[in-house]
UniProtKB/Swiss-Prot annotation:
Keyword Acyltransferase on entry: no
Principal EC category: hydrolase
GO molecular function: manganese ion binding; metalloaminopeptidase activity
Binding site for Mn(2+) 2: 264, 275, 438
Descriptive protein name: Probable Xaa-Pro aminopeptidase PEPP
Name of the gene: PEPP
């Protein structure tokens, strides 16, 4: 099951390329072509009322310009001199007793794509030296991410406005190294999804399948998950971000095994995320109603993928997915009226309440999406990506159809909207819970490159679920 962890991109993480990209974006935004970029890594934090450390997660913007995963680190980038420096913690003899020797300055210089490595004790002196040599010009930093002991007093100008935006906009377009990391995260995660398929018919509880997924990822080199995995059986799949993952797969009241398991899970590989969703029948074969909904969602995704290329408006792709959902639900008799009227009335939102997808990278919901959560149109309110797709951007494509009583009941009871839903036909589909299919794709000038290899054809999923 394990995948060789040696299949990684050659060379160092391209921190210098990223620093230059951010500096160029700062200039494009009208903030000059010189100065110091200053960023701090995440600090070590202790669990409240305890001497134990909290789980560590490096600040993504810091990692983007350094490739350094070490806590309590700093960086500077001299834009004019094109000099990238990281500052790492020095040896603390008391810590060595418990944790061993930390990375040395010499080792760090070999590992990271930087020009210099210094001790964190030298940050202020280094900033002062820059000001003395360059006449005390500008420093770019992120507000509320500067430690109290750091001083910018020697600088003539402190810019807290542009750096965060410049880094986050630069992160949208991935270079080949980043895409290789994302592809690796997808390969490992896809294998883990297959392991879950094969265990689906024998598992007794949601947590068993989560354990199989996480274990498969860890054995292949991914110690962290991109987000809390979602293992939602039966009607739990109607909750978009179900978190419990701890219910039995046989209903305690009816004694019946639940129909399906929705698995939304992805591993994090060297700080880059996979975000994949699949649905597997817990009996080994989709029920007729489950298969009908699955086929609609698969068509929603295929229609969306066919539209993807650089420059396409994501809102248009999202709208197409809604129309495919409407046509499918009309065919089943769940909806009634015309496609256009149902689309204009927003009836499909009752069954497809979230956005079609989002940018993906070091964060699951990655930067640069420009969502508008104040949008009054419910079809677009939760769309985390707006505007034209960028070539080199990585997006998730994750349509779904859900049968959530909390969401659908207000439509059914509405004098204006209830007439569009056939409650008698709908009754047959509540037990399906929800179906979502999610892939991660790189946007290209002419189309897309799908990074996700987990099977999604229903026949193949059924075969794997019943394979001995």
């Amino acid at each position: 099951m394990a995948i060789s962890v040696d299949q990684t991109p050659a060379g160092k993480y391209p921190a210098k390329v990223h620093a230059k990209r951010v500096a160029a974006r700062i200039q494009e935004l009208g903030h000059g072509d010189s100065g110091i970029i200053y960023l701090e890594g995440q600090k070590t934090h202790m669990i409240e009322d305890s001497d134990g450390e909290m789980p560590f997660r490096q600040r993504r913007n810091f990692f983007y310009l350094s490739g350094c995963p070490l806590p309590d680190s700093y960086l500077t980038y001299d834009i004019k001199a094109d000099k990238l420096t990281i500052f790492i913690p020095p040896i603390d003899p008391a810590s060595v007793i418990w944790s061993g020797l930390p990375l040395s300055v010499e080792e760090a210089l070999e590992i990271y794509d930087v020009d210099a490595v210094l001790s964190t004790a030298e940050v202020n002196a280094s900033l002062a030296h820059y000001c003395s040599a360059q006449g005390g010009k500008k420093v770019f930093a992120i507000a509320d991410q500067v430690s109290p002991h750091i001083t910018f007093l020697p600088f003539q100008e402190i810019d807290f406005d542009v750096l965060k935006r410049a880094v986050e906009e630069s992160r949208v377009v991935k270079d080949s190294y980043e895409i290789a990391l994302l592809r690796r995260a997808n390969e490992i995660s896809s294998k883990a999804h297959v392991a879950v398929f094969k265990a689906a018919t024998s598992a007794r509880n949601e947590r068993e399948l989560e354990a199989i997924f996480v274990g498969a990822c860890m054995s292949s080199g991914c110690r962290e998950q991109s987000y809390h995995p979602i293992f939602a059986s039966g009607t739990n799949a109607a909750t978009l971000h179900y978190q419990k993952n701890d219910e039995d797969l046989v209903d305690s009241v009816t004694g019946q095994r639940r129909l399906n398991m929705l698995i939304d899970a992805g591993a994090e590989y060297r700080n880059y995320c996979a975000d994949i969703t699949r649905v597997v029948p817990l009996s080994g074969k989709f029920s007729p109603e489950s298969r009908e909904i699955y086929d609609i969602v698969l068509e929603m995704q295929n229609s969306s993928l066919a539209m993807i290329k650089a420059g396409v408006m994501w809102e248009d792709v999202h709208s197409t997915s809604h129309r495919v959902a409407i046509r499918g639900l009309l065919k089943l008799g769940i909806l009634r009226s015309t496609e256009d009227e149902l689309f204009e009335k927003g009836i499909s939102v009752a069954f497809f309440p979230h956005g079609l997808g989002h940018y993906l990278g070091m964060d699951t919901h990655d930067t640069g999406g420009n969502p508008n959560y104040a949008d009054k149109d419910p079809k677009f309110k939760y769309l985390r990506l707006r505007g034209p797709l960028a070539s080199g951007g990585v997006v998730t494509v994750e349509p779904g159809i859900y049968f959530c009583r909390f969401i659908i009941d207000p439509y059914l009871s509405s004098p204006d909207l209830g007439k569009y839903i056939n409650a008698d036909v709908l009754e047959r589909y509540w037990s399906v819970g929800g179906v979502r299919i999610e892939d991660n794709v790189v946007v290209t000038d002419s189309g897309y490159d799908n990074l996700t290899t987990a099977p999604k054809l229903p026949e193949e999923i059924e075969r794997l679920a019943t394979e001995k």
